[in-house]
UniProtKB/Swiss-Prot annotation:
InterPro entries: AMP-bd_C_sf (IPR045851), Flag_M-ring_C (IPR013556), FlgMring_FliF (IPR000067), FliF_N_dom (IPR006182), YscJ/FliF (IPR043427). The keyword Cell cycle does not apply. It is a multi-pass membrane protein. It comes from Salmonella typhimurium (strain LT2 / SGSC1412 / ATCC 700720). The M ring may be actively involved in energy transduction. This is Flagellar M-ring protein. Coiled coil: none annotated. Residues 304-372 are annotated as: Disordered. Belongs to the FliF family. Its main location: membrane.
Amino acid sequence: MSATASTATQPKPLEWLNRLRANPRIPLIVAGSAAVAIVVAMVLWAKTPDYRTLFSNLSDQDGGAIVAQLTQMNIPYRFANGSGAIEVPADKVHELRLRLAQQGLPKGGAVGFELLDQEKFGISQFSEQVNYQRALEGELARTIETLGPVKSARVHLAMPKPSLFVREQKSPSASVTVTLEPGRALDEGQISAVVHLVSSAVAGLPPGNVTLVDQSGHLLTQSNTSGRDLNDAQLKFANDVESRIQRRIEAILSPIVGNGNVHAQVTAQLDFANKEQTEEHYSPNGDASKATLRSRQLNISEQVGAGYPGGVPGALSNQPAPPNEAPIATPPTNQQNAQNTPQTSTSTNSNSAGPRSTQRNETSNYEVDRTIRHTKMNVGDIERLSVAVVVNYKTLADGKPLPLTADQMKQIEDLTREAMGFSDKRGDTLNVVNSPFSAVDNTGGELPFWQQQSFIDQLLAAGRWLLVLVVAWILWRKAVRPQLTRRVEEAKAAQEQAQVRQETEEAVEVRLSKDEQLQQRRANQRLGAEVMSQRIREMSDNDPRVVALVIRQWMSNDHE
């Protein structure tokens, strides 16, 4: 009575559990279904593509247009948590960027020259000018955004109205605001590049009227940008000169001491001053054959009439005047060269005895030998070189280091002097040292393959499938296989029981079959006798003659 009451009050979950235990097929089906579901889920998870960012920081208009295009192209996408960036499968990122760029996406917050394609007929000149200014601002912003550290940019142009009066003309100005990537900054060269980019894109805009500000409100442009640019160029040029001399020294010494057994460092002092020199030289006409006559003037005056005797008494006044000579035999004074004073020759032929007098004046002007030389000095001339060279010990056959001899060091020093262009006039210095090198691990610059990102990605992809196989093996070992083993054992036991039952039944049937066969034979015999007697009765009733003949035959057979 109590057992019946306890069975009646047993809760339903326990009843279901007892039913499951009583029927071994149900746990097997449940375990198999769970294993298949887990394996399918793991396979789908392993096949899930790796998503990468396609675009980020998009406006709502660009984001909607890109999502519509991705849906039309049947490309799966998702939105990153928090940032709202659009992510697509990693193997399709570059292809989608090119395909979307072909369609003009994303357009960005600023509009470019495509704004001019939408102008309507009859637009006013003011609206046309405003649209052009907006388009120019948008194009400049897009160009600035192509720089690596720049996340976004905005450009504002102040274009004054043109005026016919020079005093009223004003230069345009520009203001540029850039939003930089986290942890990035613009160096001085990039700032100067942005300033000159905007200045060159707008007619009449000087670089000094361009203001560049970052997202924190820091002014990036300064008035002395040209000096900074020049310093950067000077530093780069100095590094190039030093590197070129260093390569020369190492290239000429490496065949002697071996690759990696020589190191050189060069310090070059360069003169970047802009120097120009103008010289003007004057030289006298020392060679009469090379003198060049510029002009000659000859004046002769003659007077005829009575006159009084004149001149110095004596034989000297009766002699003729000496011939005129060019003043090229004797160098002229500096004052004469500077003023180019003509030389005058005067002769007077007077005869105290006659009434006739003649006066002759001849002036000859010669070109002055003048030389003007204008020399512009090279910028970046080498003023002084300082070179330090370290040569490794040579290694013997047994691996022991051996220092170089004095003759070998002298030879290396001479070769280094020739390679560097050593000059005592400049005050160059050279120091060559022979010292053993320490062992250096040259593989430190490159990460091992197991630390490279590509190997890590491949390892993660393989780990997914390995995890799927491990989970499937665990499910097979812990859930499916025991149920199958139990099922096989139960089926085998049932089969053995059925076989024993069948053998028992066959033995019983064998024992029963003998009695049944005897009884059946007897019953058949009785049935046959009854059938024969019935047929004999029918034959005797129907044809008594035949019956009489048969009986007579039987009787005759008995007598015989």
